[in-house]
Regions:
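Flexible low-complexity loop/turn motifs enriched in small/helix-breaking residues
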Residues: 21-136, 156-161
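Hydrophobic h-region of N-terminal signal peptides that target proteins for export
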Residues: 10-21
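Residues at the start of alpha-helices and the adjacent loop-to-helix junctions
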Residues: 4-5, 16, 50, 82
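Bacterial N-terminal signal peptides that target proteins for export
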Residues: 1-10
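Short beta-strand edge/turn micro-motifs at domain boundaries
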Residues: 137-160
């Protein structure tokens, strides 16, 4: 899976370098949802064993056909997590993703698109890449609670055969 094959999401100008005409409130809401998704991905992928290996989480947002690394303003929202990197600093190699400069093991996570189910609920497509054989695409449920936006985890849809 290449990052350029992932699906698109409209993103705030604060998230990536590209300008946007969306209203500021919508951009702030999208940014908050994406931050919630990436925080949840840190919890999901970087357990004690991965942290001991020095694994980093490299994040990208796809605003329309090509994944892009978030801008500094977006990254500042995740500053409390020292293992988070911009995807531009990582390489997706068949045997395993790595941080380009250090060759530390990496997981590349791309968020998008956002599907608004309600004013206080979004479903977000998330793709991750560890290696050519260990990668996936899923949808995550993100809801607005009193303390802000929270990613509740993957959406499992089941139906009759």
């Amino acid at each position: 899976m290449k990052m350029s094959t992932l699906r698109a999401v409209p993103v705030a100008a604060a998230c990536v370098a590209a300008p946007s005409a969306a209203p500021a409130a919508d951009l702030a809401r999208e940014t908050a949802v994406l931050v919630a998704v990436f925080r949840q991905q840190v919890r999901e992928h970087l357990d004690a064993a991965e942290r001991a290996r020095g694994t980093v989480l490299c994040i990208a947002i796809d605003p329309g056909g090509a994944a892009q690394s978030p801008g500094q303003e977006f990254m500042a929202r995740l500053a409390g997590e020292p293992s988070v990197r911009r995807a531009a600093g990582c390489d997706a190699r068949p045997k395993g993703a790595v941080e380009a400069m250090t060759l530390r093991p990496a997981i590349i996570v791309t968020a998008g698109p956002i599907e608004w189910v309600a004013d206080d609920e979004a479903w977000v497509a998330v793709a991750y890449f560890r290696s050519a054989t260990y990668s996936a695409q899923r949808r995550y449920r993100v809801v607005r609670e009193r303390e802000g936006w929270v990613s509740l985890g993957p959406i499992l849809l089941d139906g009759p055969l």
